[in-house]
UniProtKB/Swiss-Prot annotation:
Domain of life: Bacteria
Region of interest (RNA binding), residue spans: 251-257, 275-279
Keyword terms of this UniProt record: Glycosyltransferase, Metal-binding, Queuosine biosynthesis, Transferase, tRNA processing, Zinc
Record-stated family: Belongs to the queuine tRNA-ribosyltransferase family.
Cofactors: Zn(2+)
GO biological process, one term: tRNA wobble guanine modification
Annotated residues for binding of Zn(2+): 308, 310, 313, 339
Any GO molecular function: metal ion binding
Metabolic or biological pathway, per its Swiss-Prot or TrEMBL entry: tRNA modification; tRNA-queuosine biosynthesis
The protein's name: Queuine tRNA-ribosyltransferase
Gene name tied to this protein: tgt
Quaternary structure and interacting proteins, as annotated: Homodimer. Within each dimer, one monomer is responsible for RNA recognition and catalysis, while the other monomer binds to the replacement base PreQ1.
Organism from which the protein derives: Bacillus pumilus (strain SAFR-032)
Cofactor binding mode and count: Binds 1 zinc ion per subunit.
Amino acid sequence: MSQLPIRYEFIKSCKQTGARLGRVHTPHGSFDTPVFMPVGTLATVKTMAPEELKAMEAGIILSNTYHLWLRPGHDIVKEAGGLHKFMNWDRAILTDSGGFQVFSLSEFRKIEEEGVHFRNHLNGDKLFLSPEKAMDIQNALGSDIMMAFDECPPYPAEYDYMKRSVERTSRWAERCLTAHQRPEDQGLFGIIQGGEYEELRKQSAKDLVSLDFPGYAIGGLSVGEPKDVMNRVLEFTTPLLPADKPRYLMGVGSPDSLIDGAIRGVDMFDCVLPTRIARNGTLMTSEGRLVVKNAKYERDFRPIDENCDCYTCKNYTRAYIRHLIKTNETFGIRLTTYHNLHFLLKLMEQVREAIREDRLGDFKEEFFERYGFNEPNAKNF
């Protein structure tokens, strides 16, 4: 199972930082790592056409099991021939298990050994999601990489609560493996939990590595903890994971965290950040963040980023994009979304290049300096 259908090829590590350069092979093509995965919650990366994502060299995107289960329904996606055909995307797709949405969107929830009872966030209907159901939905969706159903504890959480949660996540992971119907063409990743407790991360990693998943995710981070806590947890967690399998840090997408994660041995990242902030007119640039709605850009006829070669920056000005965002024009959101995704995918290309040339530490220093991330009260996105 560890060879198919998901295989990790190690290329080299950075002599300066230990970051890994690699390639993940899937039934729908390969992609180089470290990689950022754009999020297509409802089988679409909001406002983007698949051809545009390919043009910016996205090799894999993420879709949400919970949202697709509710709308249009996994049965409809299956009938369409699976998610790839349904959304006309022939590269790799990763689906999450639905766990995070159940724990973050639903007001009412009751966790039992069998699974989680909760209310549909759209209409209040009672729903139940279990490891078996999460596998059933993802098998129907036909993603290349599926995620095990885990419990997503809040931050901060007491040690005893977290210990029980980790034990349950391990039992659920085993049930996911048993319920997985398509191991020959869909790879199932396990999720390491344990909050900020090193002992519990060790236990979680030991349990899940013994089950021999083809890849592992580090869950329970980017949930409100300070950055130094996240970095510390990564430092003691990634070494616990097999070097010949991909490592995925869930829900992380700010430029500084992508670089910090890569330095700590992470291969895959996803986050709604670039697309979500784009809709508010916040842009990532080589000089830091730019809020295009600000009055000072009203007569600014320069591109968003003069160092960027994306479609948006080659063709449109800050003044024009500001006007579109201020008047709620959809085209404005398309332009800002395109730019932010292009920026992050390009950043990861630069990270891979820096690893190849053994200079990721230098790259981080220069980037953080330019962005102001080194300052004590550095503002994030």
